[in-house]
Swiss-Prot record:
Similarity field: Belongs to the MCM family.
InterPro entries membership: MCM, MCM6, Mcm6_C, MCM_CS, MCM_dom, MCM_lid, MCM_N, MCM_OB
Motif Arginine finger: chain residues: 527-530
Role, per record: Probable component of the MCM2-7 complex (MCM complex) that may function as a DNA helicase and which is essential to undergo a single round of replication initiation and elongation per cell cycle in eukaryotic cells.
Lineage, uppermost ranks: Eukaryota, Viridiplantae, Streptophyta, Embryophyta, Tracheophyta
Subunit structure: Component of the minichromosome maintenance (MCM) complex, a heterotetramer composed of MCM2, MCM3, MCM4, MCM5, MCM6 and MCM7. Interacts with ETG1.
Protein name listed in UniProt: DNA replication licensing factor MCM6
Residue ranges constituting the MCM domain according to the UniProt record: 345-551
Biased composition (Basic and acidic residues): 259-268
Region ranges (Disordered): 258-278, 666-705
Binding site for ATP: G395, D396, P397, S398, C399, A400, K401, S402
Tissue specificity annotation: Expressed in shoot apex and flower buds.
Length: 831
């Protein structure tokens, strides 16, 4: 249809142009109102200095069925005429829009809201040239470059100028010079200042995980964006592209090693029987005779697939988490207020989270607050303060950790689910790849970039390699990803919340050890989580019955077995509305936050307390974020003290302590013999008068104690740790003193160590009777035996009674143990 820059007349296309112009000049949403619907588009184009007119395709379908069928079936053919109709409409309605300075200014047409949205696998050669919508996930975006639309060429032989040569998806020169005396066909110079260029961007789109058939790999497709819709699709967005399918040469296939078949005619072998069918290698005559083609998609509109398909297309650039409450209708706002006014609505919101999982209310509450998030802030220096909440779930196998992650990834519009074992550092953050067509390096988004302004769920977090864990340090706190490689230096945004699940070391959580010994994660990463929850699979008859009953009901009745107070749609809408609020701290809440943080720090330094990790300023910031999220859940614009108290309780239940069992030391008291008569060697700290009064009752007391020895010796884990720490510190102090003069062994006799501890407790007025002293001596002997035989924290340096007679050893077994010299194991580190 092109000849020397002109076009052959297409009667049907001209008819489509006229009917489309009539549609623009006469369409009204309300027949009773005089104003034209698309006349407002002209004002929007003028106000935003735009060149794009957005057309709702449902309006075209309601106006003229023949017109919508022609556009849908042969869009690529009629697209220049539709653009011309838009330009004529703008000039007729506003003649001053096209000024003398820009006589060639075009108005581009963009369709949206098509009745059907196809999957990527449904795009076949039958769709070439048709107007279709396709949905997928953006995985890669190129930089914006200028594209030559209409070229102006100068003949190098005669100097003639040929204008408006349309480019057919490749660099297209005139076929022959317009001068009748010039026969030039190949020697041309492009006049760039007189040619027409447009912004151009290539986007790689991939199938969503829900659309991939079983056993298949996800397919991808290149999408070409032009004019104003460039930079509207970001990596990680699930988008709806509207446009047409075209066929372009597959350059990467031609550039690969090996021969590629081309169909060409060789004049030197015209008489040969094989003429015209020889294989030719390389990129010669690209796009003309090569046989390797692939599909591409030229889009004219971009929509974010978040359920709001009828939103204003022009507000896409500002469509982040801004407080835009105008996106909710009056009915939706009424429904949100009804949910807010429901009695005990916060617990009902929590109960509606992950209804297939029984119990775990604290974790559901943490996930809800993570979805709501805190408020992002920026300091005067331009430093961003994180508002997203990170949550880590550590638990035994089969505790529904992955169910929480799957549910969270499904309820959030922008989310990524990945596994830590199969994820590398580049796969989580970003990688630098080479463009196959240009050879230039570009950045390809990883999981954290794809989840920007969303949530990244990482399963098997503890299985990641150390070098891969280090890569997400910056992303978890500063929420940026810095890349310096292959000549590219960039800082990318990763404003995402991280929900991680990890298994404890050895498969089961050991309550007798702190969290840092139970999970294979460094303290630097643990401190970046606002909430760390531990799920322990303890046998409990009542709980096990309810869990089994719930699971069987779900398998039997499916959705009918679940009866959450609020549906998933209502929950999504409530969370979306709550995120538009930006609550501020009240003076009372600010004061309570400071007091709570000081109390947490005080508890962190108290000897004998068990904490998951050190209380730092990060935990104070976590309290602020949690308080803001709780205020959002209540639809409050002010953080109250009650919100802070709930945040403190959540932090305490998550990181301060884990319900730990008592320690049974019965086997070690049996090993010691534990005859209370052996305490004679240890000085009695209680007054002598009490000793005389109790002297007559000594035989009976000994008999009673022998009976008590048969009982179990059980102490709490906190007491065990407190006594252990005191003994180790005393031994270390003595070791440092001995090392200075080196005149004696760097250890303390066991009975002297016990006597020192009893004296220390007596100075604090801990004892009121002789029985308490004897009980503590029994505990100390059992704990020391455990530290020597089981834990290995203490070692025996010498025992002066080793060479005593065997009978004497049997008679005074406990006394012999009291004579041994103890020291701290060299590899033991005090917590």
């Amino acid at each position: 249809m092109e000849a020397f820059g002109g076009f052959v007349m297409d009667e049907q296309a001209i008819q489509v142009e006229n009917v489309f112009l009539e549609f623009l000049k006469s369409f009204r949403l309300d027949a009773n109102k005089p104003e034209l619907y698309y006349e407002a588009e002209i004002e929007a184009i003028r106000g935003g200095e735009s060149t794009m007119m957005y057309i709702d395709f449902s309006h075209v379908m309601g106006f003229n069925d023949a017109l919508q069928k022609a556009i849908a079936d042969e869009y690529l053919r009629f697209e220049p005429y539709l653009r011309n109709a838009c330009k004529r409409f703008v000039i007729e309605m506003n003649p001053s829009f096209i000024s003398d300075d820009t006589p060639n200014k075009d108005i581009n047409v963009s369709f949206y809201n098509l009745p059907f949205t196809k999957r990527l696998r449904e795009l076949t050669t039958a769709e070439i040239g048709k107007l279709v919508s396709v949905t997928g996930v953006v995985t890669r975006t190129s930089e914006v470059r200028p594209e030559l639309l209409y070229g102006t060429f100068k003949c190098l032989d005669c100097g003639s100028v040929i204008k408006n040569v349309e480019q057919q998806f490749k660099y297209t020169q005139p076929t022959i010079c317009v001068s009748p005396t010039c026969l030039n066909r190949a020697r041309w110079a492009l006049l760039r200042q007189e040619s027409k260029f447009a912004d151009w961007q290539r986007v790689r789109m991939q199938e969503t995980s829900k659309e991939i058939p079983a056993g298949s790999l996800p397919r991808s497709l290149d999408v070409i964006l032009r004019h104003e819709i460039v930079e509207q699709a970001r990596a990680g967005d699930t988008v709806i592209f509207t446009g047409t399918v075209v066929v372009i040469p597959d350059i990467s296939a031609l550039a690969a090693p090996g021969e590629r078949a081309e169909c060409r005619r060789d004049s030197s072998q015209q008489k040969s029987s094989t003429a015209g069918h020889e294989g030719v290698q390389g990129l010669k005559a690209l796009g003309v005779r090569d046989l390797s083609y692939r599909l591409a998609f030229i889009a004219n509109s971009v929509q974010i697939a978040d359920g709001s398909r009828n939103t204003d297309m022009r507000n896409r650039q500002n469509d982040s988490n801004e407080d835009d409450q105008q996106q909710f209708t009056a009915e939706e706002l009424d429904e949100i207020q009804q949910m807010r006014n429901t009695p005990d609505y916060f617990n009902k919101l929590v109960g509606s989270m992950a209804p297939t999982v029984f119990g775990h209310q604290d974790i559901k509450r943490a996930v809800l607050l993570m979805l709501l998030g805190g408020v992002h802030k920026t300091t005067h220096e331009g430093i961003n303060l994180r508002g997203d909440i990170n949550v880590c779930i550590v638990g035994d196998p089969s505790c529904a950790k992955s169910q929480f992650l799957k549910y969270t990834a499904g309820i959030v519009p922008r989310s990524v689910y990945t596994s830590g074992k199969s994820s590398s550092a580049a796969g989580l953050t970003a990688t630098v790849a080479k463009e196959p067509e240009t050879g230039e390096f570009c950045i390809e988004a990883g999981a954290l970039m794809l989840a920007d302004n969303g949530i990244c769920c990482i399963d098997e977090f503890d299985k990641m390699d150390i070098k891969d864990q280090v890569a997400i340090h910056e992303a978890m706190e500063q929420q940026t990803i810095s890349i310096t490689k292959a000549g590219i230096q960039a800082t990318l945004n990763a404003r995402t919340s991280i929900l991680a699940a990890a298994n404890p070391v050895g498969g089961r959580y050991d309550k007798s050890k702190p969290l840092k010994y139970n999970v294979n994660l460094p303290p630097a990463i643990l401190s970046r989580f606002d909430l760390v929850y531990v799920m322990i699979d303890d046998p409990d008859e009542v709980t096990d019955y309810h869990i089994a009953h719930h699971i069987v009901r779900v398998h039997q009745k499916h959705e009918a077995a679940l009866s959450p107070e609020f549906t998933t749609v209502q929950l999504k809408r409530y969370i979306a509305y709550a995120k538009t609020l930006k609550p501020k701290l009240s003076p009372e809440a600010r004061k309570l936050l400071v007091e709570s943080y000081v109390a947490l720090r005080r508890g962190d330094t108290t000897p004998g307390t068990r904490v998951a990790y050190r209380m730092t300023v990060r935990q104070l910031e976590a309290l602020i974020r949690l308080s803001e999220a709780i205020a959002r859940s209540h639809l409050e614009i002010l953080v109250k003290p009650s919100h802070v108290l709930l945040a403190v309780r959540l932090l305490k239940t998550s990181v301060i302590s884990v319900e730990s069992g008592d320690i049974d030391l019965s086997e070690y008291q049996d090993a010691n013999g534990d005859n209370m008569d052996d305490t004679d060697d240890i000085e009695n700290p209680v007054d002598g008068e009490e000793d005389q009064q109790n002297g007559a009752a000594e035989p009976a007391s000994a008999t009673a104690d022998n009976g008590a020895a048969a009982q179990k010796l059980v102490i709490s884990e906190e007491e065990y740790d407190r006594i252990t720490q005191a003994l180790v510190i005393r031994l270390r102090q003595h070791e440092e003193t001995v090392n200075k003069d080196s005149s004696e062994l760097p250890g303390i006799r066991q009975k002297e160590l016990i006597r020192w501890f009893i004296d220390q407790q007596n100075e604090k007025k801990k004892y009121s009777s002789q029985e308490q002293v004897k009980l503590d001596i029994k505990k100390l002997r059992a704990i020391i035996e455990s530290l020597v035989c089981k834990e290995g924290h203490l070692i025996v340096l010498a025992n002066e009674q080793e060479e005593a007679a065997e009978a004497e050893e049997t008679k005074k077994k406990s006394s012999q143990r009291d004579e041994r010299i103890l020291a701290v194991a060299p590899n033991y580190v005090i917590e």
